[in-house]
Amino acid sequence: MADEIAKAQVARPGGDTIFGKIIRKEIPAKIIFEDDRCLAFHDISPQAPTHFLVIPKKHISQISVAEDDDESLLGHLMIVGKKCAADLGLNKGYRMVVNEGSDGGQSVYHVHLHVLGGRQMHWPPG
């Protein structure tokens, strides 16, 4: 977890991201789901027994800069996350998280929904 905090503290918006490369299939990922609007894949550094990301194919660097026109797309990410969670057997529950900015722990400046499950989640999360 400390590694993710360090990454978030130095990450900056702008330019291409690792997620853009995954969308373009320039680097491999364990893809769970894909449609014309988004992609879901397993996190390379899982923080729970099941941990995957759902990302829009449209580049949106942060939730704070999303446009009103992105509302349907952002909602779609949650619906896809719910369906993938069910497909992966997370029937006892799961957590959905979007990190925003460096203090929020955002380490990649391409909006992404974390879905974590497979164990009891704790509160508070931070």
Swiss-Prot record:
The keyword Transmembrane does not apply. Gene3D superfamilies: HIT-like (3.30.428.10). Its main location: cytoplasm. Changing residue 93 to D: In NMAN; loss of homodimerization; significant decrease in adenosine 5'-monophosphoramidase activity; approximately 40-fold increased affinity for tryptamine adenosine phosphoramidate; loss of SUMO-specific isopeptidase activity. Widely expressed. Pfam families: HIT. Changing residue 44 to F: Approximately 10-fold increased affinity for tryptamine adenosine phosphoramidate. It is found in: Cytoplasm; Nucleus. CDD domains: PKCI_related (cd01276). One of its GO terms (molecular function) is adenosine 5'-monophosphoramidase activity. Keywords: Acetylation, Apoptosis, Cytoplasm, Disease variant, Hydrolase, Neuropathy, Nucleotide-binding, Nucleus, Phosphoprotein, Protease, Thiol protease, Transcription, Transcription regulation, Ubl conjugation pathway. The active site is at 112 (tele-amp-histidine intermediate). One of its GO terms (cellular component) is cytosol. The keyword Phosphoprotein applies. Residues 18-126 form the HIT domain. GO terms for biological process: intrinsic apoptotic signaling pathway by p53 class mediator; positive regulation of calcium-mediated signaling; protein desumoylation; proteolysis; purine ribonucleotide catabolic process; regulation of DNA-templated transcription; signal transduction. Changing residue 89 to V: In NMAN; no effect on homodimerization; no effect on adenosine 5'-monophosphoramidase activity; no effect on affinity for tryptamine adenosine phosphoramidate; loss of SUMO-specific isopeptidase activity. Belongs to the HINT family. This is Adenosine 5'-monophosphoramidase HINT1. The gene is HINT1.
